Amino acid sequence: MQDPKETINIENVVASTGIGQELDLQSVAMDLEGADYDPEQFPGLVYRTQEPKSAALIFRSGKIVCTGAKSTDDVHESLRIVFDKLRDLEIQVDEDPEIVVQNIVTSADLGRNLNLNAIAIGLGLENIEYEPEQFPGLVYRLDDPDVVALLFGSGKLVITGGKEPDDAREAVDKIVSRLEELGLLDG
């Protein structure tokens, strides 16, 4: 059977940064080709990069959130493109603004079906939320790493809240060993 850690795939990386000054988004939107700005729908300007694929949400405060990237390297590359585009518009941007990863969303596959009712009881109700009438996944909150894992009956997992790519590997290890301890990964 394949090691579940080998199935881990980064689905989304969200990071934030800022340029330390307020922006006139209306004027930026007019000068920045491909920018979407509709303040009645959303307070930020949306600028999409194609290579790597991501979206930068640029706010009047100068704060920028990058979402949709598939790796932390892609986040840095996407934001470098955004910074360069802003500099092209004569907007002052520091040489190397701090970029903080806020959330890494990953998926993985345990490779077998899971009995979520048994898992809910085995893991203890203080660490989980499981209401199949509301949502088909079991929500499992881990402390170390500080992530939330969604477990589905198919054996698929979604791990959210990670700050480092290794957080997902660590979470999968802990989930697998905990389920094995409880005898809930057999067959």
UniProtKB/Swiss-Prot annotation:
Pfam families the record matches: TBP
Keyword vocabulary terms for this entry: DNA-binding, Repeat, Transcription, Transcription regulation
InterPro entries linked to this entry: TBP, TBP_archaea, TBP_dom_sf
Sequence repeat windows: 10-86, 101-179
Record SUPFAM superfamilies: TATA-box binding protein-like
Signal sequence bounds: none
GO biological process, one term: DNA-templated transcription initiation
MF (Gene Ontology): DNA binding; DNA-binding transcription factor activity
UniProt keyword annotation of Lyase present: no
Domain of life: Archaea
Free-text function comment from the UniProt entry: General factor that plays a role in the activation of archaeal genes transcribed by RNA polymerase. Binds specifically to the TATA box promoter element which lies close to the position of transcription initiation.
Family: Belongs to the TBP family.
Descriptive protein name: TATA-box-binding protein
Native source organism of the sequence: Natronomonas pharaonis (strain ATCC 35678 / DSM 2160 / CIP 103997 / JCM 8858 / NBRC 14720 / NCIMB 2260 / Gabara)
